[in-house]
Every structure is written in C-alpha cells, then in structure tokens.
Design a protein with these regions (language model features):
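Structural preference for beta-strand elements that scaffold enzyme active sites
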Residues: 6-10, 47, 75-79, 99-102, ...
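Conserved anion-binding
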Residues: 13-15, 19-20, 24, 98-174, ...
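Conserved, mostly hydrophobic/aromatic
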Residues: 12, 40, 48, 80, ...
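Catalytic cores of alpha/beta
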Residues: 74, 78-100, 189-225
Length: 255
C-alpha cells in the first residue's frame, strides 16, 4: 500500500439539527449533530467537518455552541464552514475549538480574504471550499457555485482552485454538487482535474456510497474523502468503510 487517505465525516447543520439532502436540496432532519460527531469519533473517523448550510444566506454562523460541545468529547481535527466572512469570524470559530476554517461564499466575493486568513492563522487553517457543478456552457469543465450551490460564480473550478492556493489556501474542500447525496460514486474526472492542478491536500466529497468509491477517489488523487449519507443512513459504519478501503489497497488510519 502506498496511497493514503483520510476519512472525514461531514455534518451539515441547519439551526441546531443535523440535516442531509440530495444535490444540496430537499433537506431532511437527522438528529443531534453533537451525538453523531461523538459516535463517529468513537468509531474511528479521522476528522470532522461541520458546515452551517444556510449561514451564508442569512449572514450568520450558528455553529459556535455545537463546535464548543463537540471538542469537549472528541480529540481529532475539526473543520468548520458556513457564514465565515472575516478574519474575526475565523478567530471566533477557532476560539470555540475548531482547527480549520472552510470558506466558500466570502472567498468568491472577496478573494483577498483567503490571504488575510492564511496570514493571521497559517495556511493550514485556511481551507478553500469549492462547490462544483458540471458546466453547461464550458464542455468538460466545472463551475464554482456558492450560497449552498444556488449561485453561479462564473469561475472555472480548476482555475479557482489554483488561484485560491496562490492566495494562501492550504487545503481544498471540493464538493461535487451533481453527485452529492446520491451515493452512486464520486466525480472522478473532477477530482483528477483539481488534484493535478494544485500542490495542497484536497478533501473530496459528493457521492460516496461505499468503500470502493473512496478507493476510486484516492486513486484519482484525493487526499481525504468527506462522507455524509453513507454514514448518516447507516449504509456502512466507519469500521466497514475502513476495512473496504484497506481491501482496495489504500492505507487509512487504524481504528
């Protein structure tokens, strides 16, 4: 085994509820995000990713209390995104116990924020979140979206990823909106295009339905894979996913 992958549990939050949709739409309430975070941590997940999915629409982030409670119970990296619009917003969420900040909407609207966050807290803290959809006007390319996949940016995903890294992003969170929630496999062409274009770790999400999907993503270049529906709906456990990943010839942290 030579290729390694990190397994991340993605927890989308609306108000105080863990939610899940398909292609970022049709949200369904699933329960207490803190309880799920603790469950996945105890099962051996490598990292947690919290996203306040409506924060950018309402100019606020409601994750402070959730993050603060989570870090009392878990001892793995926690990344937080949604509604982070300034260095002060990032400072606050880090003070609650987060290790990294994922920024999408505010970075598209004001790209220099990427540099400001990287200079204030280190590039390892600045995660550029990219919501990618296959473009109808640019054959073979993807467009970056924001406001939870609702708004066009006009940015080519690969070029935006390269620009974000040049501005100081130390990691990319790449979500395929087209595949998100379907549990039918990931957009491997997208993963390969972005990972070949940048020299920082890329967390890939959207479409995981089994361990083989994660193996495919790793072989396409992903450094980490964010899982949601496959875990939330109990299709596979963290242990089962990791067993499948190892069986596919990819290294993952032992539980």
């Amino acid at each position: 085994m030579s290729k390694k992958i990190r397994l991340i549990a993605r927890l989308d939050v609306k108000d105080t509820n863990l939610v899940k949709g398909i292609q970022l739409e049709g949200l369904r309430k699933l329960g207490d995000p803190n309880a799920c975070a603790k469950e996945y941590y105890e099962a051996g997940i490598d990292e947690l990713l919290y996203i306040d999915i409506v924060a950018s629409l309402y100019n606020r982030n409601n994750l402070s209390d959730i993050v603060r409670k989570t870090v009392d119970d878990v001892y793995i990296p926690v990344c937080v995104g949604g509604g982070l619009r300034s260095v002060e917003d990032v400072r606050h969420i880090l003070s609650m116990g987060a290790d990294k900040a994922a920024i999408n909407t505010a970075a598209i609207k004001r790209p220099e924020l990427i540099t400001e966050v990287a200079e204030a807290f280190g590039s390892q803290c600045m995660v550029l979140s990219i919501q990618a959809k296959r473009s109808r006007t640019w054959p073979g390319k993807w467009e970056a979206y924001y406001d939870n996949g609702r708004a066009h940016s006009g940015y080519d995903v690969v070029e935006w990823a390269k620009r974000g890294v040049a501005l100081g992003a130390g990691e990319i969170l790449l979500t395929s909106v087209d595949n998100e929630g379907l549990q039918q496999g990931m957009d491997l062409e997208l993963i390969e295009a972005v990972t070949k274009a940048v020299n920082v770790p890329v967390i890939c999400g959207g479409g995981v339905g089994c361990g083989d999907d994660i193996v495919d993503a790793a072989n396409a270049g992903a450094d980490a894979v964010a899982c949601a529906a496959v875990l939330h709906y109990k299709k596979e456990t963290v242990t089962e996913l990791k067993e499948d990943i190892r069986a596919g010839g990819v290294e993952v942290r032992q539980v």
